[in-house]
Amino acid sequence: MSDKPATPTKHALEDEDEFEDFPVDSWPSTETLKAYKEGDSCLWEEDWDDVEVEDDFTKELKKELESNK
């Protein structure tokens, strides 16, 4: 037996080791951060709170909010 320490072997990159290329997102220009910063767009849905939810928690919360006005 030899007294040399074992040297690690280097493996070539396999196809599966490479990074996957993802397609570029094609956002409408009105929905980009640049349009938002320039004031041309609103990234939030304007009617996000228009949804009526009628569960017990919501009813109790509305009642509490009305009493605190």
UniProtKB/Swiss-Prot annotation:
Gene Ontology molecular function, alphabetical: molecular adaptor activity; protein folding chaperone
Gene Ontology cellular-component terms listed: cytosol; proteasome complex; proteasome regulatory particle, lid subcomplex; proteasome storage granule; transcription export complex 2
Pfam family, one: DSS1_SEM1
Keywords of this entry: Proteasome
Segments of this protein annotated with the region Disordered: 1-26
GO biological process annotation, one example: proteasome assembly
Superkingdom of source: Eukaryota
Entry keyword Thylakoid: no
Entry's family note: Belongs to the DSS1/SEM1 family.
Subunit field text: Part of the 26S proteasome.
Function of the protein: Subunit of the 26S proteasome which plays a role in ubiquitin-dependent proteolysis.
PANTHER family: 26 PROTEASOME COMPLEX SUBUNIT DSS1, 26S PROTEASOME COMPLEX SUBUNIT SEM1
Protein name as it appears in the record: Probable 26S proteasome complex subunit SEM1
Organism: Eremothecium gossypii (strain ATCC 10895 / CBS 109.51 / FGSC 9923 / NRRL Y-1056) (Yeast)
